[in-house]
Amino acid sequence: MSIHISAKQGDIADKILLPGDPLRAKFIAENFLEDAVCFNEVRNMFGYTGTYKGERVSVMGTGMGMPSISIYARELIVDYGVKKLIRVGTAGSLNENVHVRELVLAQAAATNSNIIRNDWPQYDFPQIANFNLLDKAYHIAKNFGMTTHVGNVLSSDVFYSNYFEKNIELGKWGVKAVEMEAAALYYLAAQHQVDALAIMTISDSLVNPDEDTTAEERQNTFTDMMKVGLETLIAD
């Protein structure tokens, strides 16, 4: 057991999908994994291990925001030996060419958080994806015929931001979308020398306000990113 995860050693696979929403973790386990067993219910942050196409994989919720994903990802890496971590979550488009239900693969993650500068006050440490996972995910998504964007995202500490116009301006600099976790995940992966990738589905748009989705859709659909994430985890 770790502080926030009740699993025993061996309960968690060395490769894992990390949705923010624990109910999305439950959905993935019930709809994509065979012989899924729940290994965590602490704080209702559900985690499951099963098999996907014969490969042992896990899925677990992380909650919202960088502090929350930092807790769960660190314990998964340090206490349970997880080596591949793929975030599957939602994001808001910052770019007029990136639309609702399309995929974004976060090649890198800018951030307005001080979570990394607490460790490196003299540096702007770049948070980047593992290239092998990124490359595999891109080709898997394209082979599925999914509209997929690759590039920088913004990991924000604030959902209801007072810097709306600044965030929009980032879209003009090539930033694809805004979300709340990728930078912290990539930083932990660099710190512990494991592989990480963030795959997001666009759930709404800051530049095309007529594009949005319901809370139920966000929980129970968006299966494209789940398929890409699972296929990427088991790819040779």
Curated annotation (Swiss-Prot):
This is Purine nucleoside phosphorylase DeoD-type. Coiled coil: none annotated. The record marks R218 as: Important for catalytic activity. The gene is deoD. The active site is at D204. HAMAP family: Pur_nucleosid_phosp. It comes from Streptococcus thermophilus (strain ATCC BAA-491 / LMD-9). Belongs to the PNP/UDP phosphorylase family. Homohexamer; trimer of homodimers. GO terms for biological process: purine nucleoside catabolic process. It is an enzyme of class 2 (transferase). InterPro entries: DeoD-type, Nucleoside_phosphorylase_CS, Nucleoside_phosphorylase_d, Nucleoside_phosphorylase_sf. It catalyses: a purine D-ribonucleoside + phosphate = a purine nucleobase + alpha-D-ribose 1-phosphate; a purine 2'-deoxy-D-ribonucleoside + phosphate = a purine nucleobase + 2-deoxy-alpha-D-ribose 1-phosphate. CDD domains: PNP_EcPNPI-like. The lineage of its organism: Bacteria, Bacillati, Bacillota, Bacilli, Lactobacillales. Catalyzes the reversible phosphorolytic breakdown of the N-glycosidic bond in the beta-(deoxy)ribonucleoside molecules, with the formation of the corresponding free purine bases and pentose-1-phosphate. GO terms for molecular function: purine-nucleoside phosphorylase activity. It comes from the Bacteria.
